């Protein structure tokens, strides 16, 4: 037997030399993919420990395929290979007898004689495993002869082909994904230009897109990316932006490219189904469960309706879904690899784009940060990672998922400001400096006006931050007593008025001077100097005293002093404090200087209170004097319109104020960062709410779809577009949330008791679904309970998509539990469960088709048809012919 063993070894040495010329140097990284079962050599020998030690320390024997095998690895999948005997157990060895190793075996080769293995043993075994007929028909000796003849493995052929054709791309088509896309495309694009009328928020978004086409500045509470993309598309379709969007339901003009206006939202809605499918695959769900998720997206009526019109939700949902899918792939990629770089960049770009379409998209970015932190926390348990590698993981994620979304956001707003450089109807909401930077904006009222404020200046004082209004007074006085029985000074009212008016003009006066005419050497007002402000029309000076304000009794009343010849003397002195003098200097300048006017007698600051006066104050906004020392934004003012007094005659001054002309001139310039900060503050803190809207709803009404939204009604029939979801799908998805939460609590308690009901692999999938889908739902739903503005059902759609994803996982997990625990006769429960799923899916399809007229608005519906679809009393469908609400 020893001679036979030696002859076999000699022949294998020759084979190894041939393979050495064909293959590359083996590297240890090829061992990383080995399974745990093949990482341990379990010797079946019953010899002594000394024999085992001697064998393990001896030079590695040669495998049946001619390459040197590692001691801790079986060389191949051939059961007749003698090196596999300890792993395979008792096998039939008809071809090559297995020699029994001795305590001191004969060395089979020296390091110089043995050729290093160019690839891992597993890669060679896998290259042969796809050919079972060859492994069955050929013996181990024939396999050696075939290898010695120069036959390359499949992996080697793949490498050779890649080297010879470096610019080739292997294309793989997923039929599930393409089928879902085609189904969604057909439903979204069917009669896309119908109805040819303004539908719901197309009124607002259409206006903004038209202003983009004409470069006119507008103000919107949401970021501009979605509107920019649609504007770019319709500009290619020949739209010039001259259509006037006046009211919901108004017909579009024949020249209006309705199809191209609605194309991008519809395309994003079509891509959402395959995006959901791929996201579920990345979450380790089966293809059938993933396909179910994509199909449910196609069959939901609310997602269909929202993606057929000029609305932003479909773009938001697509960017969110693709971003999270790329993030999951990114976390499984090797640090620094090409896949790691591209998937991380794609995830960051998509999540940044989601937040730049609507602010709610930043909730998805928050979910991404949560997933990244969870993954980093898990990496801390990996003993194979050094501290340097852990820091690289953390820093690279921070740079990618902070830097790239921030760059996307800033880039979109840079384009926004560069495009919208002309003044428009929304200018007044911005500060004077911002308006002055627009073509034909505030520059129209600053032509030729002096810069420095002096004794004798005629000015309008604008509330700089927050609500747009100007310091205003009129002849009316405060009531003697307020409804709460408090008394007032009965002085002339001072308010903050939201419109341009002649009563907004004030005169700046030195307390020691009477002549208001500005001479050749103007008396410039500087920081810290004392002035009086005299109302231009009534000629009464701005005053404050220790009398409680009308609507804000904790602050002082501000008035224009009327001398009633009583003991209450006027307190008319105000100190000018320039707050931005570090950049603008100590001289009080028009437009750019931000000032606080402090009442000298009481040290109270002139402040906009934010409250509205009743009818006796003409519903204008209250102005008070606040003794709070801290600088508040509502106490900051700036001079907007400014000119010097040229005459002492009061009537002539009044005539000049009434007939002042606004002539356009060149615009001033402010930095991009100044514009961005101002616009962001307005967008975040000055959003207009629609009180008591008949179709508004509360967050607790969304999971069970208690209220919908009427988007459009045909003027001739009861055909309408009404936002409703697939009620069976919505209710089932809500139950899925409860089922997952219950299972999570159950598993957590059982695992605490060291009872492991499911496999570790399934538990990891369960946790991943919770981290991604359950947390995604919570993070997109709970914040709305803290929002103080009018909300609608479509605000729930991002959370609904995550709820849909979680439902797909729950469906698959329940199937797993039934297959695991219902064995034997219980297998009928698995079949029954799957039959119920099919029936449920048929029900979802049936409800989708029944309510589809509300998504398209193309079919005229009778009164009875509309009534038959009112399944809940809270659904307020709109009816024609004197039936406004049912």
Curated annotation (Swiss-Prot):
Pathway: Protein modification; protein glycosylation. Residues 1-10, 18-34 have a biased composition (Polar residues). Gene3D superfamilies: 2.80.10.50. At the cellular blastoderm stage, expression accumulates in the ventrally located mesoderm primordium. At germ band extension, mesoderm expression is seen as stripes of strong expression. A very strong signal is also detected in the invaginating gut. As the germ band retracts, mesodermal expression decays and becomes restricted to somatic muscle precursors. After dorsal closure, expression has disappeared from the mesoderm and remains in the endoderm. Some expression is detected in a few cells of the head and the pharyngeal muscles. The keyword GTP-binding does not apply. SMART domains: MIR. The chain crosses the membrane at residues 256-276, 310-330, 349-369, 398-418, 727-747, 791-811, 835-855. It is a multi-pass membrane protein. InterPro entries: GlyclTrfase_39-like, Glyco_trans_39/83, MIR_dom_sf, MIR_motif, PMT_4TMC. It catalyses: a di-trans,poly-cis-dolichyl beta-D-mannosyl phosphate + L-seryl-[protein] = 3-O-(alpha-D-mannosyl)-L-seryl-[protein] + a di-trans,poly-cis-dolichyl phosphate + H(+); a di-trans,poly-cis-dolichyl beta-D-mannosyl phosphate + L-threonyl-[protein] = 3-O-(alpha-D-mannosyl)-L-threonyl-[protein] + a di-trans,poly-cis-dolichyl phosphate + H(+). GO terms for molecular function: dolichyl-phosphate-mannose-protein mannosyltransferase activity. Its EC number is 2.4.1.109. Residues 1-37, 88-161 are annotated as: Disordered. GO terms for biological process: muscle attachment; muscle organ development; protein O-linked mannosylation; regulation of synaptic activity; sarcomere organization; somatic muscle development; specification of segmental identity, abdomen. Disruption phenotype: Death during development, the few adult escapers exhibit clockwise rotation of the abdomen and defects in embryonic muscle development. Its main location: endoplasmic reticulum. Pfam families: MIR, PMT, PMT_4TMC. Glycans are attached at residues 161, 242. Residues 450-511, 522-579, 585-642 form the MIR domain. Rt/POMT1 and tw/POMT2 function as a protein O-mannosyltransferase in association with each other to generate and maintain normal muscle development. Belongs to the glycosyltransferase 39 family. Interacts with tw/POMT2. This is Protein O-mannosyltransferase 1.
């Amino acid at each position: 037997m020893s001679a036979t063993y030696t002859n076999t070894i000699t022949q294998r040495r020759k084979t190894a030399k041939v393979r050495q010329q064909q293959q590359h140097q083996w590297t240890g990284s090829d061992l990383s993919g080995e399974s745990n079962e093949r990482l341990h050599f379990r010797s079946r020998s019953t010899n002594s420990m000394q024999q085992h030690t001697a064998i393990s320390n001896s030079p590695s024997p040669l495998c049946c395929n001619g390459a040197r095998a590692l001691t801790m690895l079986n060389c191949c999948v051939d059961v007749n290979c003698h090196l596999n005997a300890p792993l395979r157990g008792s096998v039939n060895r008809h071809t090559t007898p297995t020699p029994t190793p001795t305590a001191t075996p004969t060395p089979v080769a020296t390091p110089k004689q043995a050729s290093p293995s160019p690839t891992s043993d597993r890669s060679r075994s896998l290259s042969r495993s796809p050919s079972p007929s060859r492994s069955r028909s050929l013996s181990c000796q024939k396999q050696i002869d075939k290898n010695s003849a120069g036959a390359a493995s499949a992996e080697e052929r793949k490498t050779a082909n890649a080297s010879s054709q470096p610019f080739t791309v292997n294309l793989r088509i997923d039929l599930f994904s393409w089928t879902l896309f085609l189904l969604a495309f057909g439903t979204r694009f069917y009669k896309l230009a119908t109805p040819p009328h303004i539908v719901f928020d197309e009124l607002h978004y259409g206006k903004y897109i038209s202003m983009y086409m004409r470069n006119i500045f507008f103000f919107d509470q949401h970021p501009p990316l979605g509107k920019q993309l649609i504007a770019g598309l319709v500009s290619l379709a020949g739209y010039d932006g001259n259509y006037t969007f006046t009211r919901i339901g108004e017909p579009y003009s024949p020249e209006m490219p309705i199809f191209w206006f609605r194309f991008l939202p519809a395309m994003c809605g079509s891509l959402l189904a395959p995006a959901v499918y791929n996201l579920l695959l990345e979450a380790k769900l089966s293809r059938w469960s993933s396909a179910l998720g994509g199909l449910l997206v196609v069959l939901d009526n609310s997602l269909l309706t929202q993606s057929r019109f000029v609305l932003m939700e479909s773009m938001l949902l697509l960017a969110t879904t693709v971003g999270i899918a790329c993030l999951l792939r990114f976390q499984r990629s090797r640090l620094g690899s090409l896949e790691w770089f591209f998937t991380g960049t794609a995830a960051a770009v998509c999540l940044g784009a989601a937040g730049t379409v609507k602010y709610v998209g930043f909730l998805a970015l928050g979910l991404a940060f949560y997933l990244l932190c969870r993954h980093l926390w898990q990496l801390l348990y990996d003993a194979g990672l050094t501290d340097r590698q852990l820091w690289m993981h953390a820093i690279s994620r921070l740079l990618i998922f902070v830097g790239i979304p921030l760059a996307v956001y800033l880039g979109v707003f840079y384009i926004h400001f560069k495009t919208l450089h002309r003044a428009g109807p929304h200018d007044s909401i911005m500060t004077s400096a911002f308006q002055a930077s627009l073509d034909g904006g505030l520059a129209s009222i600053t032509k030729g006006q002096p810069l420095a404020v002096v004794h004798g200046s005629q000015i309008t004082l604008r509330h700089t931050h927050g609500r747009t209004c100007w310091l205003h007074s009129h002849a009316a006085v405060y009531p003697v007593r307020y409804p709460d029985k408090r008394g007032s000074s009965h002085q002339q009212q001072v308010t903050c008025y939201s419109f341009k008016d002649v009563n907004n003009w004030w005169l700046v006066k030195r307390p020691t001077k009477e002549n208001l005419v500005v001479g050749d050497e103007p008396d410039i007002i500087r920081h810290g100097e004392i002035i009086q402000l005299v109302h231009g029309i009534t000629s009464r000076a701005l005053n404050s005293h220790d009398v409680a304000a009308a609507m804000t009794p904790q602050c002082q009343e501000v008035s224009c002093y009327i001398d009633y010849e009583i003991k209450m003397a006027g307190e008319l002195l105000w100190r000018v404090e320039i707050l931005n003098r570090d950049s603008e200097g100590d001289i009080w300048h028009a437009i750019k200087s931000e000032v606080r006017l402090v009442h000298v007698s009481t040290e109270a600051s002139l402040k906009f209170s934010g409250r509205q006066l009743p009818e006796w104050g003409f519903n204008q906004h209250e102005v008070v004097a606040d003794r709070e020392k801290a600088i508040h934004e509502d106490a900051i003012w700036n001079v907007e319109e400014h000119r010097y007094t040229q005459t002492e005659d009061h009537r002539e001054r009044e005539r000049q104020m009434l007939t002042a002309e606004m002539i356009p001139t060149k615009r001033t310039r402010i930095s991009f960062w100044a514009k961005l900060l101002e616009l962001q503050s307005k967008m975040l803190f000055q959003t207009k709410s629609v009180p008591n809207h008949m179709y508004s709803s509360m967050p607790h009404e969304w999971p069970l779809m208690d209220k919908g939204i009427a988007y459009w009604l045909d003027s001739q029939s009861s055909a309408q577009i009404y936002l409703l979801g697939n009620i069976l799908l919505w209710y089932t998805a809500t139950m899925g949330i409860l089922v997952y939460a219950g299972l999570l609590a159950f598993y957590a308690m059982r695992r605490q008791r060291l009872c492991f009901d499911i496999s570790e692999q399934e538990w990891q999938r369960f946790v991943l679904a919770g981290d991604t889908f359950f947390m995604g739902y919570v993070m997109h739903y709970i914040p709305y309970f803290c929002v103080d503005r009018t909300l609608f059902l479509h605000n729930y759609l991002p959370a609904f998509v995550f709820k849909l994803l979680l439902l797909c996982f729950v469906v698959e997990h329940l199937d797993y539990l039934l297959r695991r625990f219902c064995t034997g006769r219980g297998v009928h429960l698995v079949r029954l469960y799957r039959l119920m799923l099919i029936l449920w899916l048929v029900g979802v399809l049936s409800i989708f088709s029944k309510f589809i007229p509300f998504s398209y608005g193309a079919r005229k519906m009778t009164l009875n048809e509309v009534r038959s679809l009112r399944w809940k009393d809270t659904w307020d469908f709109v009816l024609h012919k004197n039936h406004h609400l049912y």
